Amino acid sequence: MLALKLSFAALAVAIAAPTFAAQPPYMDDRSTAASLVRSYYNAINRQEYARAYTYFGDSNAPQSYASFAAGYANTASVTVATGTATDDGAAGSTYFTLPVAIDAVSTSGAHTQFAGCYTTRLVQPGIQDPPVTPMFIFKAKLSPAHGNIRYLLPQCAP
């Protein structure tokens, strides 16, 4: 009888316990333009907006941190697709242009797609003094799009 009561108690706890969505594993890879952009959206998906904000570098963020974080208040998740990056060298830096398409899911479950180009910048590590600046998002331009993100990747001029 005690075993039966314990079984019902365990079942009641299991039913009443909230179900949490699995959080994606942490990713912070700034070695290529594609991995940098995937890491950026990994931070968004984990609601680590301060980490996401740092992917724009020390002085390249498009807006204040408060506005940036507030812009994701109704975002539940983002799926990203990337194309092939092209590179363009400049004195001491390499710029990479990357086609990107995303599917953003709101907290209400609505899906919205965007497509565009990200430009990342790598200041050559061999010419830097500490602290070394890793690759960062130099600029990003996304526009509304519709459809499967695998087919929305645009052509990006270097």
Where are these regions (language model features)?
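Bacterial N-terminal signal peptides that target proteins for export
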Residues: 1-8
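Short helix-capping and inter-helix turn/linker motifs at the boundaries of alpha-helical repeat units
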Residues: 27-31
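N-terminal signal peptide c-region/cleavage motif recognized by signal peptidases
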Residues: 16-18
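Exposed beta-sheet edge and beta->alpha loop/turn motif
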Residues: 91-158
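Short solvent-exposed beta->alpha transition segments
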Residues: 23-24, 34-35, 39, 49-95
